Structure formats: C-alpha cells, structure tokens
Amino acid sequence: NFLDCCQSFEIKPIIVLFDDCHYPFPQLGPQPLPIRGIHNSGWKQSPGHQIVTEIFELKTEKHLKRLQTYTQELLELYKEDERILMWDLYNEPGQFGIGEKSYTLLDYVWNWAHEIRPSQPLTSCLDGSIGDSIIALNQNKSDIITFHTYEAEKLEPTIEKLRTIGRPLMCTEYMAREYGTTFEFCLPIFKKYNIACYNWGLVAGRSQTNFNWETILYLNEERDKGNLVREGDSLTEPNQWFHDIFRQDGSPYSTDETAFIKKILSNKELQ
C-alpha cells in the first residue's frame, strides 16, 4: 500500500532498514503518542543500541538470524521493484553515542544485502555516520555515495571532498532553515555540481519535524505534562520551520520557497 501510494504521486522512496538515531528500546505493538511541539518524539532506533551492542560484544547471536531474515526477505521480495529508488541499508551508523560498536552489525548487513544483490543501488551514508571504520566500510561498499549536511558552510566543502571518490553522489539529508541550508541556498549548489538530492520531509505531520532539534531537550517535561498529539488534534507550528514544506491542508510554509523550487527544477535561468 505504501509503495502504491508513493507511485500515485510519482514519488520513489529510499527504503531504510536500520537506524542508530533517536530513541532506544523499540518495541512492537501500539506506540506512544507524539509529544506536542517536539521534533520526532516517536522515532525509534532499529534494531536499537542494546541489540547492536550485544552483537558487537558477541554475547549472543540470537539476534543475527532474525535480522538476516528481515534484511534478505525484504530485499528479495522487492529487488526488482521499480517503485523503489534505492536501499539505504543503515542510517547514520555510530550516531547517538554508540560509535564503532555499530561496525559489526553494519558489516553483517552489507554482506546480507550483497548476497541478494537487488537491482536498485545500495548505500549507507558517509557524512552523517560516526567512526573511521564505519565510514570506510560505507565508502567501499556503497553503489552511490550518500551524505548528510545541514550546516550551510559545510555543504560545498563536503561535496568537493566526496566527489573525488568517483562515484555518483546524492545528499539524502539536508535543509535546516535555521542553519542556512534553505532550498534557495542548497539547490543551486547541487545543480552546479550535478549532485542528486533527496528531501526527506514533505508534509508537516505528527512527527513534527518542522520543529527544531533543540525541542528534544523538553521531551520529558512536555510528556509529563500530558502535552500529547491525539488522533484528530490540530497541530501547532513554529514561526520558522526547521524542515518540511507543506501543511496538512496542502498549503506551503512559504510560497516564495515553493516558487523557487519549481523554477530551478524547470531549468530556467535563476535570477
């Protein structure tokens, strides 16, 4: 259903299997309600730092068969599906303090994926990951070199550094308005270098990624107050959006911004 929905809007998703970012201890079943005004309050790590650490410490291999089955069955099922743009096997391995411990699982995941070898490209980001061995592994294994850059002053130097690798480049995370990586700033640079870019946020929904990262500091306080987003509740919004483009009613955060996006994508000369 998800892929059909994406196809109906001419969107090709990048499918992410594992992730070291945000909150640990993921569990199956009903999930906690989002916390109002907090960036991405429900996002969970996959499979979670506890399991990643156990795999690193070789305390148990009970998780490996399950994770291998998850990885390979998914890739096998959709390996020829043209609705999928790419597989991002592991988002930002090493993030949120776990560091090089993620290397062990990451290496397993790359090997599992190459046993299936889907038709779509495989990747895991360089800039955005933590740890020299992790970054080196991703650079060696990725069909397309992907990177994450939110700070305006780092975007062009990052591209200059990574283009020497000699493989196609795609920026799969960018656009934090308060850090200067607006569409008006980033898209001309991507166009200059012929770099692909993928905007992960579209509509400001219950994940509330239009609020900035600093709001995470108030997560426990707001949760204790019971300040939750329930089904059918209207959503508040900050004066300056961090990420995302549209409201749920389809109106843009900035009409000037969406006009600029349309203009640069139409290949008309920028003013």
Regions found by a protein language model. Give the residues of each.
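Active-site mouth of glycoside hydrolases
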Residues: 1-144, 148-149, 153-156, 164-165, ...
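Aromatic- and carboxylate-lined catalytic core of secreted/periplasmic carbohydrate-active enzymes
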Residues: 193-271
